A protein has these predicted regions:
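Extracytoplasmic
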Residues: 1-157
């Protein structure tokens, strides 16, 4: 029988995160670190680059594969779940401000508003937020994990 996917040369299995391990190993290891260092009863909130549903850019990859809540998920899904974009738009703007603002007090206020414990900075965030200055995150928190190009900052409380 012909397959929509063409001639499959190798068996991929059902491990849905395998591609991430191959394509974005730093993100993959960050997800494993989060799973090992958080508990289901006290899940922290993370902030990461948000995006569109099923995006080839792989936004929201940390929250999607770790199960840890994020400030905003895929925009269209969030919109459909809530029945309005009025909730989605301000959250997307807040995420942009976290990554692009130079005003540390503003960033702290937004992080507190959502109870963010971890800030993700990887390839996706660097590509999307052109004016991102990572030094500010070292000022408002500490690096708790780093693998390859992915850094996880824990927000100081």
């Amino acid at each position: 029988m012909r397959s929509y996917f063409g001639a499959l040369k190798r068996y991929e299995g059902i491990y849905g995160i395998a591609w991430l391990e191959r394509e974005h190993p730093g993100d993959y290891r960050t997800i494993l670190w989060l799973k090992e260092n958080t508990t289901p009863t006290s899940l922290p909130v993370i902030v990461e680059s948000d995006g569109d549903s099923y995006s080839p850019k792989d936004e929201n990859r940390i929250s999607a594969f770790s199960g840890i809540p994020t400030v905003i998920g895929w925009a269209v899904h969030e919109w459909l779940w809530r029945g309005t974009y009025d909730v989605v738009s301000p959250r997307r703007e807040d995420v942009r401000r976290i990554y692009e603002s130079d005003n540390l007090e503003e960033i702290r206020q937004i992080l507190g508003k959502y109870g963010v414990r971890y800030i993700v900075v990887g390839r996706m965030e660097r590509e999307r937020f052109a004016s991102l200055d990572e030094q500010k995150f070292a000022t408002i928190g500490t690096t708790v994990f780093q693998s390859g190009e992915t850094v996880l900052y824990e927000v100081a409380r």
